[in-house]
Amino acid sequence: MLKNPATKYRSFKPIDLTDRQWPSRTITRPPIWMSTDLRDGNQSLFEPMDAQRKMRMFKTLVQIGFKEIEVAFPSASQTDFNFVRELIEGGHIPDDVTIEVLTQARDDLIERTFESLRGVPRAIVHLYNATAPEFRKIVFNLEKSGVKELAQNAARTMKRIAATMPETQFTFQYSPEVFSGTEIEFAKEVCDAVFDIWEPTPEHKAIVNLPATVEMSTPNIYADQIEWMHRNLKRRDSLVISVHPHNDRGTAVAAAELAVMAGADRIEGCLFGNGERTGNVDLVTLALNLYTQGVDPGLDFSNINEVARTAEECTQLPIHPRHPYVGDLVFTAFSGSHQDAIKKGFAVQKPDAMWEVPYMPIDPADLGRTYDSVIRVNSQSGKGGIAYLLEQGYGVVLPRRLQVDFSSAVQRFTDDSGQEVTSAQIWELFQQEYVQNATPVHYVGHSLSERDGREHIKLTVDINGTRRVLNGAGNGPLDALMHAIGVPVRIQHYEERALTQGADARAVAVAEMAGADVTGSAFGVGIDANLVTASIRAVISGVNRAYARVNAQAKERFFEAAMNDATESVGV
């Protein structure tokens, strides 16, 4: 690093806005939310989502409550084009959801973009071109007039093509890319020129998106930029001001919140902050920040763990354990004083009272989560902690979510005994909780065979003391097992590893089970010399623990399929 960074880096020039109003404002209603997980988020992945993962993400976004979703850059690839067509032709777009597509300012790309939208009832077409000085000079070699003319020509093309598709209600959106680094007066000039061509009205508004494509300043300066545009744009009553903050300086959430205070109506971002470089603004954090201030965000994260697992599986990116609201350690306290304060807070918290639990800005139950403290089990252990003792003493490496889950059982044990717990006691308790759980389903044995390219299982179990032989088929042993047992839960996560090495090696398998009637998720662990047997034992243990977490009505029908006369169940 340079001793004098001023020789290489310029400080950002503030906006002359001495009478700024945003610092005295508060946010009392949610902005319009626009998810760009399928476009900006997807293009930033090591391996972009395939069609199946894209569809899963789209349906998750709809379920959460997003009404505007940027789904593709149709002119960029045949894959994106085909996905838009599948959404339209497959009837996947709900009546209250509007899809958005992105296009650069070139006639052929615009034409291709509109072609992808044929037959859609309504859509947002998002036009952009870069306006910042370094892009004008280095990337495009254009003067200001050339950049403005490029945007105007593209705007005319969009208006002309849209007129030939009267069956679709189009909303036009324009972004001066790298707005955050563009001279503010020039950004206004280009935006005004585009909207003079589109001629939006208060009844049929256009969207002006003002992105911090690269976050270059403190959030207050971005807020000044937004307020200046809010005051000075022509046709303000016919425009929706949108912001698209990136997180290069780590302050995208603050920038978005201040931008709304400064006059923005709409925010573009991604779940959990996915996106180019350091990511787009995290829409989950923004929404739940509003929620903790008593404002309904209009997005439903009442099962945030499910949303998180979907996002991780679709993007192949892990969520940081300290990520606000959703990280595995967010509702975990290692400090004894923190644990004590939280425990006392829960003890006095009334169900209908205002939330006042120390160290916890939100009730984890509102997100479908629980408070679990990962306790320091033995001060003599050096590194301390349950996971450390199990790994060092018994070779069991706990996934983080299982570590948090098991810590509750250990906490109950230590509370009841009032004594320090030993590693041997932890191991015995672990086996009782997750490995030896044989009620109501007790594993007896199984056999596997392969026919017609599918795995077939013959599973012998005792269910509430009654011997049953169950048959199923699937794409692998676990798929076949789930079809055989026929319970209303699914394998949400599965992992396996060697427990010991050598001729007498044993394997440990961990299955995380979830279902509509199951509170949270339920873990099962299997340990056996045979890996497949270990995995079957893990799933059955997880099924037993899931059964314990459903209500009485769900319990009555939980094993209906298995208790009927067994016929082979084949997965599609």
Curated annotation (Swiss-Prot):
Region of interest called Regulatory domain, as start-end residue ranges on this chain: 437-572
Co-factor requirement: Mg(2+)
Binding site for Mg(2+): 40, 244, 246, 280
Catalytic EC class: transferase
GO molecular function: 2-isopropylmalate synthase activity; acetyl-CoA C-acetyltransferase activity; magnesium ion binding
UniProt pathway annotation: Amino-acid biosynthesis; L-leucine biosynthesis; L-leucine from 3-methyl-2-oxobutanoate: step 1/4
Gene3D superfamilies tied to this protein: 3.30.160.270, Aldolase class I
Listed GO biological process terms: L-leucine biosynthetic process
Ranges that cross the membrane: none
Enzyme Commission (EC) number: 2.3.3.13
Pfam families from the UniProt entry: HMGL-like, IPMS_D2, LeuA_dimer
Subcellular location(s) per record: Cytoplasm
Superkingdom, taxonomy of origin: Bacteria
Signal sequence annotation: none
SMART domains tied to this protein: LeuA_dimer
Entry-linked PANTHER family: 2-ISOPROPYLMALATE SYNTHASE (PTHR46911:SF1), PTHR46911
Function (record text): Catalyzes the condensation of the acetyl group of acetyl-CoA with 3-methyl-2-oxobutanoate (2-ketoisovalerate) to form 3-carboxy-3-hydroxy-4-methylpentanoate (2-isopropylmalate).
Subunit structure: Homodimer.
Protein name as annotated: 2-isopropylmalate synthase
Organism this protein belongs to: Paraburkholderia xenovorans (strain LB400)
Upper taxonomic lineage: Bacteria, Pseudomonadati, Pseudomonadota, Betaproteobacteria, Burkholderiales
